[in-house]
Amino acid sequence: ICMQAGEYIIENMPNALVDVHHPEIKVYIEIRKRAYVYVTSIKGPGGMPVGTSDRSMLLLSGGIDSPVAGYMMAKRGVKIEAVYFHAPPYTSERAKQKVVDLARLVSEYAGNINLHIVNFTDIQLYIYDKCPHDELTIIMRRYMMRIAEKIARERHCLSLITGESVGQVASQTMQSLAATDAVCNMPVFRPVIAFDKNEIIEIAEKIDTFETSIQPFEDCCTIFVAKHPVTKPDIAKMEESEKNLAEKIDEMVKKAIEEREVICVKPCLLYTSPS
């Protein structure tokens, strides 16, 4: 095949020289039902077919990082579902729509995504009322992880995915991540854990989520934020603080899960008719 192709090229391009070691142009031939001959290739996303690595639950916020984390896991063949924590009236319907839009953008790479929208308002207010304010962020994160895990198990997911990057904010120090992981009994994957913000933004721009992520609508992680949040939380102390929630929290978590809204988000693929 190579000899026949080479002979044809030489006959039709008599001025072309053959250099098998350092060619300026490489000719590629793929044999399937027919022969495909080409001289350039465009790099795609790469990775594995979605679904070949089972199912995982993505904690999807309105920020830059979590959509990138979902995209990166989808590249490795993971089927994505997502959970978003909504806190009306402190977070608006536009904030919710922003997350739906982000899920749709990620679905262009991951296929259909079931987006579980959990009303987190009552739980946040209860934690704010009962727990030390410097621990608010971590305790709220711990309950998000608990809820996400319960939904994940219900949906037969084998792991959780978050968009945390170590040291980026107070809730993402090594100690803080250990404190949130302590309440989970399934693996937590953090694909962007060692990336800096510029590296994450570069991927977000490539997958077209960046412009949506920077829309100025607050999510529930940006409200009730302590002025001086703890950055080296003690897990035993967190557990002691959470005892203040014992009277109502289990029932509140159960209600939030049972009353969640589920949206099946599908890709908006645009096809151009051949001219």
Regions found by a protein language model. Give the residues of each.
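RNA-binding accessory domains that recognize and position tRNA/RNA substrates
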Residues: I1-M57, P67-I113, T121, A182, ...
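Active-site adenylate/phosphate-handling loop in enzymes that bind or generate adenylated species
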Residues: Q4-N15, T40-S53, Q124-L125, D129-E202, ...
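Conserved G/P- and acidic residue-centered "switch" motifs that form tight phosphate/ATP-binding loops
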Residues: G63
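A short alpha-helix-loop-beta-strand transition element characteristic
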Residues: D208-P216
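Conserved small/polar residues in nucleotide/adenosyl-binding loops
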Residues: Y271-S275
